[in-house]
């Protein structure tokens, strides 16, 4: 495997950054400083140190993104920009997909991976992965309406939602909603069942992952080893 490709696989940098760091002498392979980033390394046996830290090959790529408004949760779209379009070409690995969906105008935490097995396990209905959203609504949500939320609501098509958590803040027109399912436009439709309307929606957690507060809208980072292990355990 090429050294720059190996470095990208570890989640430490993009390919362009890898090339710069190799040229700067910030990378060693088995104690030797390589001249170029296109030389081959053995991903299973060689010891690679990047900027003073030993890095290990990852078979799969895992990315946390702070999804901005107006971007769709899809691998490709003929009309709108997708979450994959926000990644550099060398980071968009074959088979990468958004794990779960956020509506076009919903913001926040999006998990992207090329690990199809893990993704499908996390998205399986029986997994009941908890998702927390920060919301604002047009009208205040009353305590009685909050109880209806927590007991499950009947949507306009007759679907009975699973019990959902809701924590109200301020005047009751904002707070946090917790779901264990992910039906199409679910929170929007649940508020509409209360004759209310969502004016702002942002996902702040997905299972064991919490949105990194340092990520600006449209920014992304690789998951840490600890976050990957937590996802595996959760699935």
Where are these regions (language model features)?
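Basic, flexible Lys/Arg- and Gly-enriched helix-loop patches that mediate nucleic-acid binding at interfaces
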Residues: 1-235
């Amino acid at each position: 495997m090429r050294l720059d490709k190996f470095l990208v696989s570890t989640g430490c940098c993009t390919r362009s950054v890898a090339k710069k760091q190799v040229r700067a002498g910030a990378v060693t392979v088995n104690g030797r400083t390589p001249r170029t980033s296109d030389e081959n390394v053995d991903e299973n046996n060689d010891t690679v140190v990047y900027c003073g830290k030993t890095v290990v090959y990852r078979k799969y790529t895992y990315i946390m993104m702070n999804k901005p408004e107006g971007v769709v949760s899809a691998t490709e779209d003929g009309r709108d920009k997708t979450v994959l379009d926000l990644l550099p070409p060398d980071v968009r690995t074959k088979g990468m997909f958004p794990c779960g969906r956020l509506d076009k105008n919903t913001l926040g935490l999006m998990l992207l991976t090329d690990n199809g097995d893990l993704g499908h396990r996390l998205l399986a209905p029986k997994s009941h992965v908890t998702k927390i959203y920060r919301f604002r609504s047009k009208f205040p949500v009353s305590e009685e309406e909050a109880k209806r939320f927590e007991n499950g609501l009947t949507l306009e098509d007759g679907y009975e939602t699973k019990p959902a958590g809701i924590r109200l803040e301020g005047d009751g027109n904002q707070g946090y909603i917790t779901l264990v399912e992910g039906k199409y436009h679910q929170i929007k439709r649940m508020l509409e069942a209360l004759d209310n309307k969502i004016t702002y929606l942002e996902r702040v957690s997905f299972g064991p992952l919490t949105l990194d507060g340092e990520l600006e809208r449209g920014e992304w980072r690789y998951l840490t080893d600890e976050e990957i292990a937590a996802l595996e355990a959760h699935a």
